[in-house]
Regions:
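Intrinsically disordered, low-complexity regions enriched in serine, threonine, proline
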Residues: 285, 290, 309, 343, ...
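Residue-level detector of buried hydrophobic side-chain packing
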Residues: 60, 146, 169, 298-330, ...
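Polar low-complexity, Ser/Thr/Gly/Ala/Asp/Asn-rich disordered segments used for subunit assembly
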Residues: 1-35, 43-50, 55-299, 303, ...
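Glycine-centered structural positions embedded in regular secondary structure
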Residues: 38-42, 104-106, 305-310, 314, ...
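Structured, hydrophobic secondary-structure cores that serve as assembly/anchoring elements
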Residues: 1-89, 321-514
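Helix-centric, low-specificity signal for extended rod-like, repetitive segments
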Residues: 244, 281, 286, 305, ...
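A periodicity- and composition-biased signal for non-globular, repetitive helical segments
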Residues: 268, 299, 318, 398-400
């Protein structure tokens, strides 16, 4: 067969070592330590970092505060990520806010004077602040105390003002996404003291940000895990300036002519049907994308994305084929996404099934509120150009394992590659020094398969390609090498390891009747 890679003409004169991944090529069926993470979200004016530029890695939380602002979206992403991946190399690109954007706001109205002593509780983002209320405190005094408490905390992503017993809370960042910050804000009395505090409707910010320039900045480098703050609740497109365009960027960057191995991780705060609409959009139907869904959560979708990027890094940086099945908070596996305040917003069994069949990974919760994953999947679930479901590249480790396998093969090739090309030597003749041959290339690829399917694998001494003997033989049989006028073409069908996701036990009760 004539082997060609997408986007690279057969007569392209430039020297190269290129690769193309074609996923879902098998039979139909129903990081390394060098991997880094980039956060792509909003800063505040307090941060010194220029927008839409990629600077040095973030050194620590104080460096993050100085460069992006302590109340910023990036700062809260950084905190969420560091809970699970304290050693990861983390970059950030600040997305410029829309020039006409407005902040989100909400009011809290205090009704009357307190008839006794109590504590006013302020819950946000998994944190609780408390304000002492004394008997006789007027509505305005209570509102002022609440407002002062909010403004005194430098880590909250909003600030307040007060007038006539009404406190108005305004987000630090602008645009419609900032409404998530206020949706999760709860204020209430620990003990009823003859008054109330009423939360008004959240007025969502306006003027969505556009990721186009930030993506241009990211196009100058290669960072494995991307955790953007952009999110969606409906279908996306490849030119929408947000989720769909980000997916298209990752797709384009992975093309053979560019050759960057990257993945993008999004957070969704929406219903199951809304998540399906996002992930099954043609622009988002991508093996290199992951959508992690919560509903009415105390964390923003941006924080969920960052936390899940940390989880992926933690699991895959040593063993790229790691499973997320059953991932939960435990010794060595931090997982801190909070249980929704409204327990009806936990995903039901039916919703989990629907999510997993439509390219969405739901964040599940135990009856006691512990977060966990049923399994992790990519957003690819539809055969392109059709309405047919395709689950051959569903498991989340597939792009990670194939990227690691390619990196291993690439490193072996560049250390043994010779400057010249020739056909295979005659039977019995010794290979000639300084020449690559089709047979030599085939032996190299088969050797890589043997290593990556055995305990000799450099990835924690565990195979990242399927070690089943039949799978190994299929991979070896799939190797195709062709000699060209000035190079070699190679095709191989790698099969990543398969995870143990489903174990069924049938227990039969025996014994005599009595």
């Amino acid at each position: 067969m004539a082997l060609s890679l997408l986007g690279i003409p057969a007569d392209d004169p430039k020297a190269r070592i290129a690769r193309e991944f074609r996923y879902a090529q098998g039979e139909s069926g129903t990081g390394s330590p060098g991997r880094a993470i980039v956060l792509v979200a909003n800063k505040t004016a307090a941060g010194s970092e220029p927008v839409e530029t990629l600077g040095e890695p973030i050194q620590d939380i104080n460096d993050c505060f100085v460069r992006f602002g302590r109340r910023s979206e990036i700062a809260h992403q950084y905190r969420a990520l560091r809970m699970v991946a304290p050693r990861a190399t983390v970059y950030a690109v600040a997305v410029a806010e829309n020039g006409t954007a407005a902040a989100s706001t909400v009011t809290f109205t205090f009704a009357t004077a307190a008839t006794g002593s109590s504590t006013l509780r302020i819950d946000w983002g998994g944190r609780r602040l408390e304000v002492g209320i004394a008997s006789g405190d007027s509505a305005n005094a209570q509102a002022a105390a609440f407002n002062a408490k909010v403004n005194a905390d430098p880590d909250l992503p909003f600030s307040g003002s007060v007038s006539n017993g009404v406190a108005t809370i305004t987000t630090a960042n602008l645009g419609p996404r900032s409404a998530q910050l206020l949706n999760a804000l709860r204020v209430y009395y620990a003990v009823n003291v003859g008054t109330t505090v009423s939360k008004g409707s959240v007025t969502a910010g306006t003027g969505a940000d556009d990721y186009t320039n930030a993506l241009a900045a990211l196009g100058t480098t290669s960072i494995y895990y991307h955790a953007p703050a952009c999110t969606a609740v409906s279908g996306v497109t490849a030119t929408d300036g947000g989720v769909g365009q980000y997916c298209q960027f990752i797709r384009d960057q992975a093309a053979p002519a560019v050759g960057k191995d990257q993945q993008v991780i999004f957070g969704l705060d929406c219903t199951q049907s809304q998540g399906t609409a996002v992930a099954t959009s043609s622009a988002a139907n991508l093996v290199r994308a992951g959508f992690y869904r919560v509903q009415a959560n105390d964390w923003t979708s941006a924080m969920v994305a960052a936390h899940m990027a940390g989880v992926r890094w933690l699991k895959e940086q040593a063993y790229p084929a790691a499973s997320l099945t059953g991932y939960a908070n435990g010794d060595g596996t931090p997982f801190a996404i909070p249980d929704p305040y409204d327990k009806t917003k936990r995903p039901s069994s039916t919703e989990v099934t629907a999510d997993l069949n439509n390219g969405v990974t739901p964040i599940c919760f135990t009856p006691l509120g512990g977060p966990n994953l049923d399994r992790g999947i990519t957003s690819y679930s539809v055969l392109p150009g059709t309405a047919n479901k395709d689950y051959r590249a569903r498991e989340s480790h597939i792009p990670s394992a194939e990227d690691a396998a390619w990196e291993y093969l690439y490193q072996r090739w560049i250390t043994t590659r010779q400057p010249n090309i020739a056909g295979d030597p005659r039977p019995g003749a010794r290979p000639m020094k300084g020449f690559n041959t089709p047979g030599g290339m085939k032996r190299l690829v088969n050797s890589a398969i043997d290593v990556l399917t055995s305990s000799a694998s450099p990835f924690d001494n565990m195979p990242i390609l399927d070690p089943d003997p039949a799978a190994v033989q299929r991979m070896r049989d799939s190797v195709y090498v062709e000699q060209r006028a000035d190079g070699i073409g190679v095709s191989v069908n790698w099969e990543p390891v398969r995870h143990d996701n489903k174990d069924d036990f049938l227990i039969l009760q025996g014994g005599p009747a009595y």
